[in-house]
Amino acid sequence: MNSIDPRAIIDPSAKLADGVEVGPWSIVGPDVEIGEGTVIGPHVVLKGPTRIGKHNRIFQFSSIGEDTPDLKYKGEPTRLVIGDHNVIREGVTIHRGTVQDRAETTVGDHNLIMAYAHIGHDSVIGNHCILVNNTALAGHVHVGDWAILSGYTLVHQYCHIGAHAFSGMGTAIGKDVPAFVTVFGSPAEARSMNFEGMRRRGFSDEVIHVLRRCYKIVYRQGLTVEDALKELAEPATQHPEVELFRQSILSSARGITR
């Protein structure tokens, strides 16, 4: 059974699964689907086309699925898809996509999106990510699984943040951040790898040691990116984590943060 506060406004075309809660003064617009067990707090605005999965919690004053402010957007049908078990805290804004890209903004599963964070149009957020308060992602940004972006991190459009990467507070990211890399500063500079995060997630000492050596190859030996990638080729055949690091560099379109 759903629990809908009588002061909420639910469009007749919205689809709410069993166990959904909607708080007072929230608005659920046309073409919005909400999965089982999701809790919508007070004063939340959901605009479609938006699909929200199961067992999410969205806190007050969040705006989810609004039109993009991209000046090229002319009202074309685009959407937002949010997975399961996400926590979206107070005042978060997430925009739908544009037809110039994927026409979809995507948020995966088990993410924590903290107060006043912004996810721009056509962005893709993986699983188990943390976006700390006031983090702002421009359009077309990709964030890999388990990445952590500390408070007030700013990410330029089209940047890719690799899996397990970490940014310090107030970091301004203008280039891609490879998997596992820790960046700080404005503009961002690579400082190390997220070894503490690896330990917490059960990475073996051997893998951490190998990744440490690979980081030094890319960032401490004065090699070009092309030459560093050649040096990573052999260890990448033995360790999938190194291959993940290598591929995140190889696939970079904007160049990597160094």
Curated annotation (Swiss-Prot):
Where mainly located?
cytoplasm
Q: What is this protein called?
A: Acyl-[acyl-carrier-protein]--UDP-N-acetylglucosamine O-acyltransferase
State any single GO MF term.
Answer: acyl-[acyl-carrier-protein]-UDP-N-acetylglucosamine O-acyltransferase activity
Lipid metabolism found in the keyword field: yes
Q: Which UniProt keywords apply?
A: Acyltransferase, Cytoplasm, Lipid A biosynthesis, Lipid biosynthesis, Lipid metabolism, Repeat, Transferase
Organism for this UniProt entry = Pseudomonas putida (strain ATCC 47054 / DSM 6125 / CFBP 8728 / NCIMB 11950 / KT2440)
Q: In which pathway does it act?
A: Glycolipid biosynthesis; lipid IV(A) biosynthesis; lipid IV(A) from (3R)-3-hydroxytetradecanoyl-[acyl-carrier-protein] and UDP-N-acetyl-alpha-D-glucosamine: step 1/6
Reply yes or no: does the keyword RNA-binding apply.
no
The EC number(s) given in the record are: 2.3.1.129
